[in-house]
From Swiss-Prot:
It is found in: Cytoplasm. PANTHER family: GLUCOSE-6-PHOSPHATE ISOMERASE. Gene3D superfamilies: 1.10.1390.10, Glucose-6-phosphate isomerase like protein, domain 1. CDD domains: SIS_PGI_1, SIS_PGI_2. This is Glucose-6-phosphate isomerase. One of its GO terms (cellular component) is cytosol. Pathway: Carbohydrate biosynthesis; gluconeogenesis; Carbohydrate degradation; glycolysis; D-glyceraldehyde 3-phosphate and glycerone phosphate from D-glucose: step 2/4. The keyword S-adenosyl-L-methionine does not apply. It holds the Pfam family PGI.
Length: 549
């Protein structure tokens, strides 16, 4: 990947001037100027996903300049480098090939001259066989009973992705009950173990190195709990499987290495649900549905790699995001799924985006000080969010671009619930884009029989300025295929932005310092002696903790 400062490109300079020219033009005026705006500013994927980006502060010149920016920043070359297995994660000297995990085409993909696809397919075949045994009841626990509960123990990418997907695809789940334990807080594992029976519980320990502090702390506690009931260490093999690459540590734990599912250093944690880390997904929804999840992602990979920029959904969303955060002053993006099954979608991409693009050092090692990199990602399902934080989005002083996501078909057609849900979905983006003028507020009062004189003091509070940017993503139905495509769409959006931000999106050095300091502090917490080895604040906090515990 090349080292190109985006602010030094001709397109960036032109965009700065263009922003000034467009500054006083509202979204409403853009719709008035362009009668076919919806058709011109929306794209479809596989006739199952519609992405409408018309309610943004952009026109065709904006898009043209943003596409020029992508070209000047060598996006196409970077995309091919990723798909071809080049080591684009330079700080760790790794390829980035989560796309290979879902490559249904079986086209060879080379890393260091070796085709990785045979190994990928071998792990998938092993996962399929394992899932069939557990789901069918052939796999027995230590008392001869079939498995009823699966506990996935992992953190970060080993937890957020599998948890999000199993929740999103609950309509497809089988009889197995899934549990996810991530936090090193003992409460998380303790409360989970209260719900399960050691005779019928399978634990998946998800840690590439099998040394992750939080994961192994929880796994050891689960092991102790299990052995207290089973009283036989040889039975660990029937109740624990490992998603790891460290066979030595897995075996030491007591897990049969036949029940160890590998993945590779070219799979980043936050892009790993497509790998063996997704075993909990496959156990929950069945392997056929897991393959559909992969197929949807693969289809989006093909779209992203081959569609021209004008029709390229991930690239378009990425470029609009760059426009919003670097030219319009937005600092956050809200992800608002109008689907309760997607209640962890924003949390998943909070990690996906912020761990990838939350960087301040450019690819040449220099500090970035004249443009913004990754935005803050947050969100909640609709309509819950409407009764919580939408007030600020509508009438606050900050610009918050929003992605509204909704399925046209529901899995639970109860009464008129879905129509009411979707009426809110459509209404919110309309309200955010077009607002309500003072004249409209006054007209409402007059219609209600009020005189303008008696309401003049309240009128300003009921005005909505509008002109708030949104994308609307309408999915025909949330299925394994469409969910896979949606996830891959956002993955590639993050990639595009990282290329243009001139950063390395696939490392996460920012998580290391806190870990190092925690390892230093941990032994200091054992005794009763006063601590003085830190700053006065940290010393004071540790010493108060010791006094109170």
């Amino acid at each position: 990947m090349q080292n190109i400062n985006p602010t030094q490109t001709n397109a960036w300079k032109a965009l700065e001037q263009h922003q000034k020219d467009l500054d006083q033009v509202t979204i409403q005026q853009l719709f008035e100027q362009e009668p076919t705006r919806f058709n011109d500013y929306s794209l479809k994927f596989a006739e199952q996903i519609l992405v409408d980006y018309s309610k943004n502060n952009i026109n065709q010149q904006t898009l043209s300049l943003l596409r020029q920016l992508a070209k000047e920043c060598a996006l196409n070359e970077a995309t091919e480098a990723m798909f071809n297995g080049e080591k684009i994660n330079r700080t760790e000297n790794r390829a980035v090939l989560h796309t290979a995990l879902r490559s249904c085409a079986n086209t060879p993909v080379y890393v260091d001259g070796k085709d990785v696809m045979p190994e990928v397919n071998a792990v998938l075949a092993k996962m399929k066989s394992f899932c069939q045994r557990v789901i069918s009841g052939d796999w027995k626990g230590y008392t001869g009973k079939a498995i009823t509960d699966v506990v996935n123990i992992g953190i970060g990418g080993s937890d957020l992705g599998p948890y999000m997907v199993t929740e999103a695809l609950r309509p497809y789940k089988n009889h197995l009950t899934m549990h996810f334990v991530s936090n090193v807080d003992g409460t998380h594992i303790a409360e989970t173990l209260k719900k399960v029976n050691p005779e019928t519980t399978l634990f998946l320990v998800a840690s590439k190195t099998f040394t992750t502090q939080e994961t192994m702390t929880n796994a050891i506690s689960a092991r102790k709990w299990f052995l207290a009931a089973a009283q036989d260490e040889s039975q660990i093999a029937n109740h624990f499987a490992a998603l790891s690459t460290n066979a030595k540590e897995v075996e030491k734990f007591g897990i049969d290495t036949n029940n160890m599912f590998e993945f590779w250093d070219w799979v980043g944690g936050r892009y790993s649900l497509w790998s063996a880390i997704g075993l909990s997904i496959a156990l929950s929804i069945g392997f056929d549905n897991f393959e559909q999840l992969l197929a949807g992602a693969h289809e989006m990979d093909n779209h992203f790699r081959t569609a021209p920029m004008e029709q390229n959904i991930p690239a378009t969303l990425a470029l609009i995001g760059i426009w919003n955060c670097n030219f319009l002053g937005a600092e956050t993006e809200a992800m608002l799924p109008y689907d309760q099954y997607l209640h962890r979608f924003a949390a998943y991409f909070q990690q996906g985006n912020m761990e990838s693009n939350g960087k301040y050092v450019a690819r040449n090692g220099e500090v970035i000080n004249n443009y913004q990199t990754g935005p803050i990602i947050w969100g909640e399902p609709g309509t819950n969010g409407q009764h919580a934080f939408y007030q600020l989005i509508h009438q606050g002083t900050k610009i918050i671009p929003c992605d509204f996501i909704a399925p046209a078909q529901t899995h639970n057609p109860l009464s008129d619930h879905h129509s009411k849900l979707l009426s809110n979905f459509f209404a919110q983006t309309e309200a955010l884009a077009f607002g309500k003028t003072q004249q409209e507020v006054e007209a409402e009062f007059v219609k209600a029989g009020k005189s303008l004189d008696e309401v003049k003091e309240i009128v300003p509070f009921k005005v909505f300025t509008g002109n708030k940017p949104t994308n609307s993503i309408l999915v025909q139905k949330i299925t394994p295929f469409t969910l896979g495509a949606l996830i891959a769409m956002y993955e590639h959006k993050i990639f595009v932005q990282g290329v243009i931000f001139n950063i390395y999106s696939f490392d996460q050095w920012g998580v290391e310092l806190g870990k190092q300091l925690a390892n230093r502090i941990l032994p200091e917490l054992t005794g009763d002696e006063s601590i003085s080895s830190h700053d006065s604040s940290t010393n004071g906090l540790i010493n108060q903790f010791k006094a109170w515990r």
